[in-house]
Regions:
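Membrane-proximal basic amphipathic "stem/tether" segments
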Residues: 1-69
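S-adenosylmethionine/decaboxylated-SAM
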Residues: 67-77, 82-248
Length: 248
């Protein structure tokens, strides 16, 4: 697995260099000013993107991708997008969104699924986030806001409390793994954990997404099922995993 990961990184670097070189060549055709600045930017960007620490971070993130076996994904649904996903989630349910930001997706959860109770969990690092949530959802019924760390929030609720939750926080392997473990017992048997950014390697600023690794590892270790994935071509995908009916 380590060899395949290293080969993947080598190919990724090669492809990026090829595309960037092509871009540089195209910019010269249009007499773009400060072409030396463009060259400097890409050279510095690639230097930061592919240092040894980034290589290791990406490898650590993808090393668990083969945890799953076929029985974990049998019957998995492909769903067009995450709004269509909401249409298939349980209605009149006890729900949480973990990672609310300004509340736009929470508003869609509320409108589409008509929850019995909707818990909105976020540290709300900036005032504008909480102000936006209050503006959009503050007058809605059956909504409770929790300004708390996503992992620690699991301690707030009783076991088997939620029908389903949706996670959209910092997308790292470590945080996602901790969130899944924190909320696993809080989900009713047969209930769901869903979340955003279900892919693996993001190259923005050398940042490695680890949601897929964390989800696959959790499913395999706890014998859950990968219930559904979304297929957005221009937006990050979502996942749904299901807790076994006989698991407390």
């Amino acid at each position: 697995m380590q060899e395949s990961a290293e080969e993947f990184l080598k190919q990724l670097k090669k492809d990026l260099h090829r595309y960037i070189d092509a871009f540089k060549e195209k910019t010269r055709d249009f007499k773009v000013g400060h072409i030396e600045d463009i060259d400097k930017f890409f050279d510095e960007y690639l230097g930061k993107l592919f240092d040894s620490k980034t290589d290791q971070r990406i490898f650590d993130s993808i090393k668990n991708l083969r945890f799953l076996e076929q029985h974990h994904v049998d019957g998995c649904k492909a769903i067009l997008d995450r709004i269509s996903l909401l249409e298939q989630m349980p209605k009149n349910a006890v729900v949480a969104e973990i990672g609310v930001d300004r509340g736009r997706f929470a508003e869609r959860i509320y409108e589409v699924t008509q929850p019995q109770k909707l818990h909105l969990i976020d540290i709300f690092q900036f005032d504008y986030q909480l102000n936006s949530v209050n503006s959009i959802l503050g007058k809605k019924e059956n909504i409770e806001i929790h300004q708390v760390n996503s992992v620690e929030a699991g301690n707030v609720f009783d076991d088997e409390y939620f029908d389903w939750i949706y996670i959209d926080t910092d997308h790292t392997y470590e945080t996602t793994k901790a969130e899944l473990n924190s909320f696993a017992d809080k989900i009713k048997p047969g209930g769901f954990i869903s979340g955003h950014d279900y892919f693996q390697v993001g190259i923005s600023n050398g940042f490695s997404y680890g949601v897929m690794s964390a989800v696959h590892e959790f499913v395999a270790i706890n014998n859950w099922k990968l219930y559904a994935v979304t297929l957005e071509p221009l937006e990050n995908q979502s996942f749904v995993i299901q807790k076994p009916d006989n698991q407390k």
